[in-house]
Amino acid sequence: MKLIQISSKHYKFLYDLLSERKQFENISHKKLPSYNNHIKFIKSKPYSKWLLIECKEKIIGSVYLSKNNEIAIWIKKGIKDYKMKIRKKVLEEIITKFTRKRYFANINPRNKKIINFYKKNGFKLFYSTFQLEGKKDENLKSDDKRKIEFYKKNGYRIAQHVYMFEKNL
């Protein structure tokens, strides 16, 4: 397994990889952007590091490290990542090559497989964000139970809930 730089010849692969995601895996968008908008996004260099994952001379996924030290690893659906071994190697390589004081992973709480992966690799849950849709949006912490219940009773619905995990080095 090795990590390689992204070039324009990889745009289609990255778009296809994004297209594979199920709704519960996403936290950044509610619907798939157009191909052209995705190319603009890639060209904007939104992350500190954004690399492709190559295994046995085949590109199988991507990984990024954001400017806020957030890590996200995406592997194509057809690839059997037995017991998360590829994902673990990628995580270890990112942490080794791009040393930071701490790292984060933002995960949709319904994505149990990935939550368990990060927990097994030393990440700890330290923050939850709730997004409410209704008359107004407000970020709530998971311990704001009374506020959450108040909003639910008054016509709001939880549109998104994100767990943030961190790993300190």
Question: What are the roles of these predicted feature ranges?
Answer:
Residues M1-D16:
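A short beta-loop-alpha structural element at the N-terminal edge
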Residues L14-S19, H38, I42:
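Hydrophobic alpha-helical core bundles mediating ligand binding, dimerization, or RNAP-core interactions
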Residues D16-K30:
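Helix-loop element at the rim of GNAT/NAT acetyltransferase active sites that forms part
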Residues K31-I79:
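Acetyl-CoA-dependent GNAT
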Residues Y64-I73, R100-K101, F126-Y127, A159-H161:
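A conserved beta-turn-beta hairpin within the catalytic core of GNAT-like acetyltransferases
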Residues K80-K97, K112-K120, K145, E149, ...:
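Conserved acetyl-CoA-binding loop-helix of GNAT-fold acetyltransferases
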Residues F104-I115, Q131-K147, E166:
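Conserved beta-strand-loop-alpha-helix junction that forms the acyl-donor binding cleft
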Residues K119-T129, K152-H161:
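Conserved acetyl-CoA-binding loop of GNAT-fold acetyltransferases
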